[in-house]
Structures are given as structure tokens and as C-alpha cells.
Amino acid sequence: MENKKFYITTPIYYPSDNFHIGHCYTTIIADSIARFKRLSGYDTFFLTGTDEHGQKIEKKAKECGVTPKEYVDKIVDNAKDLWASLNISYDKFIRTTDKEHEEVVQKIFKKLYDQGDIYKGEYKGLYCTPCESFWTETQLDENGNCPDCHREVHEVKEEAYFFKLSKYQTWLEEFLESHPDFIEPTSRKNEMINNFIKPGLADLCVSRTSFKWGVPVSFDENHVVYVWIDALSNYISALGYLTDDDTLFKKYWPADLHIVGKEIVRFHTIIWPIMLKALDLPLPKKVFGHGWLVIDGGKISKSLGNYKDPREYINAYGVDAVRYYALREVPFGSDGNFSEEALVTRTNSDLANILGNLVNRTIGMVNKYFDGKVTNTKIYEDIDNDLIDYATSLKENVTTLVDNLELSNAIDKIFDLFRKCNKYIDDVTPWILVKDESKKGRLECILYNLLECIRIGSVLLQAFLPTTAERIFKQINTKETSFDTIEKFGNYESPNTVNTPEVLFARIEK
């Protein structure tokens, strides 16, 4: 079989302050997809990191009385600790202050300049420092402020280098037309085409002289490379592009999936494709722009300061409660409201009631009725068919949903199996069967069916709630945890002895 590869990225986050639940949301989703692909047999590379240059960080560091590098080092250490506490399984964490990255950026800038795609000119425009974005008069909000963060913009005028986006306008339009799935969801694609591309692409300012915290332009020391050529290059610099060792680049590029927030879709679907075209490199297969998590209708953001440390939620409710909420609550692509109350409700209704209760009841019955040991007696009845059919088709159905980036539906599909198991218990009434000695073999088959369904669901759950899946494997005492063990029913060990049940998720009283 052909060696399957999968390269997935989060955006590189801007470490102007500690990360919030919005950063966690993006990263948990990317991590779950990466884990699912690994479990499905893909040679997977999962990249995340930080975009550390720019005027805003230079200014923040000055206010704190430290160098920009000292400032970002502290934030990055905090971010890595947060990712560890969320079980984020990235293969590489790239920083734009890494020497290797800076050298690649300089080479890319020089290459584009040498071939005439970058030229020197003068920039006049309106600049939003918090967003690091330039705007025209017509793009400002009704108060004349930044349309993204609604803060004041400042007029700037300075010598700058420009990237000829306009040269590639027709090519980009034709590319998007011939690759309809490149930008998802469709609403973002339509927004890019109608609001940004069709009105005409202006050449892009790609250097600055008004601050120094950035990658120096190698042939003009007065300039630093402005954010997007620096930041976007991370996806290829992380793989060793234009270095002595480009093994990873040859192996994994082009990326299969860039996951980004909707506010940076335009940079990833206009500037990035044009950069790659100018460098004569293949384009990523898909850019998915997800929605925002909102609090009381407003975006959770560092600049608004309307959030608390995500570790408070992890410490209060457990890592997998936070992961489950992020994956299940909001259909990927839409905006969704974040509330601690909803997190508690989800934890109680789904994790404690549906899953926790099922595992506890099943192991409890095996211990009570069969001293903890169960064998597959294969004394099936018609009532088993629906459950077994659902369980054996689950991998294929969940895989389709993950491939379509329907993460909320994918995890709900797994929980549908657990719901069916709970209903199955109510329908087959083990507590009545146990009173009839002649039904003992049938009762044992029922409990085996339940343990096998719990195993199958948990094998898939590994991608989303890895800690919980491991705890379930331990409690039901199985080593059959790979994806290829769940295509047919009956791979749970037989005979087998279960372990003592433990509470997976305690009900939260609020």
C-alpha cells in the first residue's frame, strides 16, 4: 500500500499575551485530526508555533522593561506548558525567532526580489497596531476605526518594499475556480472572492522601517520583513525548505490542511498562494477558516482581555472535559458561544451520564454477575443486530465525518454508540435475566457485547479524548486498541477479566 502522509498546521499564534480558550479551540481540533490520521495509518506531521515579531511586541516588551526576545520567551514557555496540559501532540513547535526560520525568510525575500516580484516604493496608509494590518479608508468601520478590532488606526508614511500581488490576480482567480475545495467553508470562499479578490488586488507592503523587531532584509539593513512573508513562511521553513536538510519538506509538502481563524483567512488564501506560486511551489490542499468562540456575543481576544487562563477550566473539570466541549459544542466553521455553564452541562449530560454511567454499569454487572470474568458465548438474539451493525460501521462513518472536518458530528456519532448501549441495557434487562440460570449464557453474551461496544467506541475516542480512552482500556482490560481491530465485531479478548470500575467523570454540582 502507498505510504499515506498528512501534514496539518495550526496558525502560528501571536504571543503578545498568554493564550486563551480560543487558541485552545483551534489547537484541540488540529490535534484531534492529527491523532485520528495517525491512528488511521497516516505518516502525520502536526505543526504549531508562534509568530513573534512586530511592532506590538516591541512596544509591549518596552513597557515591561525587557527585550522583545525575553518577553516572547516567557509567553512561549507558558504556551508550551498549556499545550502539554491539553495533551497536544504536535511534532514541531516553530518560533519565528528561530535562527533557521529567519534565514529561510531572508532567502525567500531575496529570491522574490531578484525575480522582480518584490520592489521598493513608498507606503502611505492607515495602520492598526494591535492587528498588525493596513487598511484603506473604505475598509474602516463606521467610526473610522479598524474593522477587525475597532480600535484607532494611525496614518503612516515610510519607504517600503512591496510584493506584486496584482501580477497574480488572474492566476489566483483561475486557481480558486479550478480548486473549489481549496477554501472552506464555502461562506469564507465567497467572502474572499467577492470582498477581496474581485475588487482587485493591491500590491502588498512587505517591509517596515519604523520598528526593528523583525527579520532584517538581508540586502537593505534599514528594513525588516513585515509580518506576512515572515509568518506564512513558517509552514515551509519548519520542514527545512531552502536549507541543507530539506528531507521533511520533500516528504510532507504540500500541506494537507491549514486550520486558521476566520480573521486570517484572507492572508492564507490570497498572499500565501501567491507567495507559493512565485516560489514555484505546490499549494496546500485546503485552508479551513473556523469561526470564533464568543463570550456574550464578542470575540474572546487578548486585546479585549475578556478571558481567564484555560488551565483554570482544566484544573476544575479535567482535560478531556475541556477537549470534549471544544470539539462537540460548536460545529467547526461556525461561531460559537463559550460559557463555563455550558461546559458543565456538557460534562454532566454526555461525559458523566452517557459514557461514565455506561462504563460503570457494565463493569459493575460483570463483577456482580460473573465475578469480573466474561466470555463471548455468541448466544445472539435479534435485538443485538442493530447495536452490532452500528458498532462495526462506526469507524467508516466517523472517518468520513473527520475527513469532512465535521468534528462535532464525528464525536457525537461515537456517543450515539454509547447511547445505544445504555438503551440496550434497558431493553435486555440483565437484572431480570440473572435470576434465570438457563439464561446465564445469554446474559454473558450481552455483557460481552457491551464491553466490545465500549472498546470500539473508545478506540475511536482516542483521537479526541486520549486520557479517557486510556482509562477505559485499563478498566475493561484490553490491549486491542488499534483502528484495524474495530472493523469487525468480537475482537475484545475472550475470556477476559475486567478491572475495578473507577468514576470517569464525576457529576459537577454548580
Predicted regions and their residues:
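A broadly conserved sequence feature marking short terminus-proximal activation segments
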Residues: 71-127
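A non-catalytic, amphipathic alpha-helix used as a structural packing/dimerization or gating element
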Residues: 32, 70-81, 107, 354-361, ...
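A charged helix-plus-loop insertion that forms the helical arch/lid used to bind
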Residues: 60-73
